[in-house]
């Protein structure tokens, strides 16, 4: 397959520059006959989850296409779902560069992007132009300069704007790169946020005459006690799904490697075991009351099967896709 050669060239570039270059090329060929070069035939393996039918269980995780610029090109690769974002009410530049690092030996990434995006209105315009026939997830967050106490307002603003266009909405309260954001995962702050989100979902469902499920994305760095509390809150508020997990602050598996001490969230192979364990514990606690979307270090068929065996109904990839490329999509969907 051609990807090892493409990867070699891309890995000569700074990681963020490589990402920008790739998206530039994808945008250039979308809607032209060259788009056929991206298209991969994958088997149909329908899965029902959150009241939606997914063409197959494999999705692209949020963070790769923050502004919804390459939905059709990514969809052509065979994903059953594509999750775009994280998007915030207002555009923001994110953290200072450099803010994305490859840990090549570990097949991991560290990022401290900080929700860099062009704002929810820009994303909605891009979504309107897309023709992807899979499930489109839209991941929403709060602006960095919005006080955490008013954070729920940012989620409600984004919900209202994306609701007519989303297959499902993902609530990101677990990025380590927005100060104070992870505090929304705990106790009264979480209950307050979930109550507001559920109320907004009901209001918007009546307004638009359609139901859009809401999933909450959680961190892998929760203690067992915290995880049990989160699970209890999700069930009490009738949230439709949980995405487990976001990136980790734990560096125990990458000690001594280049960039291991960079601030930010670690993803990829070093996150694999930790995220699978969170899924297993969450599954035990939830007892099937809401579905789990498993993400974190999936880079092979076996890693994908482990997530499903632990209790995930759907799975997503990101870092594995960077390191293994489009062939990973076909390989996982074919052999799941």
UniProtKB/Swiss-Prot annotation:
GO cellular component, one term: plasma membrane
Catalytic residues (positions): 175 (nucleophile)
GO molecular function: dihydroorotate dehydrogenase (quinone) activity
Cofactor note: Binds 1 FMN per subunit.
Recorded metabolic or biological pathway in which this protein acts: Pyrimidine metabolism; UMP biosynthesis via de novo pathway; orotate from (S)-dihydroorotate (quinone route): step 1/1
Cofactor: FMN
Bilayer topology: Peripheral membrane protein
Subcellular localization: Cell membrane
Family of this protein: Belongs to the dihydroorotate dehydrogenase family. Type 2 subfamily.
Protein name, entry field: Dihydroorotate dehydrogenase (quinone)
Lineage per the UniProt record: Bacteria, Pseudomonadati, Pseudomonadota, Gammaproteobacteria, Enterobacterales
């Amino acid at each position: 397959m051609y990807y090892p050669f493409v990867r070699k060239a891309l890995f000569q570039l700074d990681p963020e520059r490589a990402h920008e270059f790739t998206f530039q090329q994808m945008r250039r060929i979308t809607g032209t006959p060259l788009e056929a070069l991206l298209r991969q035939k994958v088997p149909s393996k329908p899965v029902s989850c959150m009241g939606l039918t997914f063409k197959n269980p494999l999705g692209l995780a949020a963070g790769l296409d923050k502004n919804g610029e390459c939905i059709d090109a990514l969809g052509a690769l065979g994903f059953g779902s594509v999750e775009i974002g994280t998007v915030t009410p207002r555009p923001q530049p994110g953290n200072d560069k450099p803010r994305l690092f490859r840990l090549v030996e570990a097949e991991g990434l560290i990022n401290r992007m900080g929700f860099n995006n062009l704002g929810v209105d820009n994303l909605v315009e891009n979504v309107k132009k897309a023709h992807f026939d899979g499930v489109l997830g839209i991941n929403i967050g709060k602006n960095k300069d919005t006080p955490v106490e008013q954070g729920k307002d940012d989620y409600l603003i984004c919900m209202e704007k994306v609701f007519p266009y989303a297959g499902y909405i993902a609530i990101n309260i677990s990025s380590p790169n927005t100060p104070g954001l992870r505090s929304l995962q705990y106790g009264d702050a979480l209950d307050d946020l979930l109550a507001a989100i559920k109320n907004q979902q009901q209001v918007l469902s009546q307004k638009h005459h359609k139901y859009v499920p809401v999933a909450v994305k959680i961190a892998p760095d929760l203690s067992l006690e915290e995880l049990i509390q989160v699970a209890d809150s999700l069930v009490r508020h009738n949230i439709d799904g949980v995405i487990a997990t976001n990136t980790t602050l734990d560096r125990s598996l990458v000690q001594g490697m280049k960039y291991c001490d960079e601030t930010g969230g670690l993803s990829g192979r070093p996150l694999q075991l930790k995220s699978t364990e969170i899924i297993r514990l969450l599954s035990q606690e939830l007892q099937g009351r809401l579905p789990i979307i498993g993400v974190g270090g999936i880079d092979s068929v076996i890693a994908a099967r482990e997530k499903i065996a632990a209790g995930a109904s759907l799975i997503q990839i990101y870092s594995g896709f960077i390191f293994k490329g489009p062939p990973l999509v076909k390989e996982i969907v074919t052999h799941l």
